[in-house]
């Protein structure tokens, strides 16, 4: 599995800010403050040629387009992306993999994401991060996320080796950031989303959602 992944350096090519802004305007209605915050992140990437040490946490009520923002950023970065749905991850082993001593052992979701992407530089879209601390199995999935977010390397129990994570960029969504532990919250720049008015929702449906459905 490790041999199937292209392990790249963390050097990041400059992003065209005009193209980035165009993508944001295509994908998102309004949200000027959010777009400006994303553009600031892009300027930082262009200045350092590395991904920021922090990820983005998009926090707001259901139906405000949090996931859409995450996908737009992944598109701007031109990186493969994978989704971690924390509401369905009940056991840390789902993330870390299981030891080879078990007959049903296999790599975890994180290692499988690297394998599917075929490279080490990718976006992890972590949906419902506020549900990460509600594990029902042997431990807390939130503790595993910390090792992924620290960019110091991630250990998969099945692979039995350290996986470089310097090329990982996490973008998380949450409804309630107060449910997220302080250590995890400190790894993100938080973007708060207001709820849309009924009139704005009508515009979004007619000018953004409906055309995309018809295009498919």
Regions inferred by a protein language model and the residue ranges of each:
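Pre-Walker A (Motif I) flank of P-loop NTPase domains
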Residues: 50-56, 120-122, 168
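The Walker A (P-loop) glycine that initiates the GxxxxGKT/S ATP-binding motif of P-loop NTPases
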Residues: 58-60, 97, 128
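Conserved C-terminal "switch" segment of AAA+ ATPases
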Residues: 10, 118, 176-186, 190-216
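Conserved alpha-helical scaffold flanking the Walker A/P-loop in AAA+ ATPase domains
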Residues: 101-126, 157-162
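AAA+/P-loop NTPase substrate/partner-engagement loops
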Residues: 76-106, 113, 133, 200-201
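Walker A/P-loop
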Residues: 51-86, 115-116, 181-182
């Amino acid at each position: 599995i490790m041999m199937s992944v292209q392990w790249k350096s963390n050097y990041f090519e400059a992003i065209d800010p005009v193209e980035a802004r165009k993508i944001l305007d295509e994908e998102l209605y309004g949200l000027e403050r959010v777009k400006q915050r994303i553009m600031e992140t892009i300027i930082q990437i262009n200045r350092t040629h590395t991904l920021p040490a922090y990820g983005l946490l998009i926090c707001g009520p259901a139906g405000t387009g949090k996931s859409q923002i995450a996908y737009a950023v992944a598109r701007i970065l031109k990186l493969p992306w994978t989704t971690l749905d924390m509401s369905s991850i009940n056991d840390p082993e789902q993330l870390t993999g299981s030891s080879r001593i078990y007959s049903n052992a296999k790599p975890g979701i994180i290692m499988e994401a690297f394998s599917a992407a075929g490279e080490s530089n990718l976006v992890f879209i972590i949906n419902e991060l506020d549900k990460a601390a509600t594990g029902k199995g042997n431990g807390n999935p939130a503790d595993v996320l910390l090792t992924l977010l620290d960019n110091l390397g991630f250990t998969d129990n099945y692979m039995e080796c350290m996986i470089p994570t310097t090329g990982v960029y996490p973008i998380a969504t949450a409804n309630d950031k107060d449910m997220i532990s302080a250590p995890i919250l400190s790894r993100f720049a938080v973007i708060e989303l207001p709820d849309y008015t009924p009139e704005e929702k009508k515009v979004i449906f007619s000018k953004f959602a409906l055309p995309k459905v018809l295009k498919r």
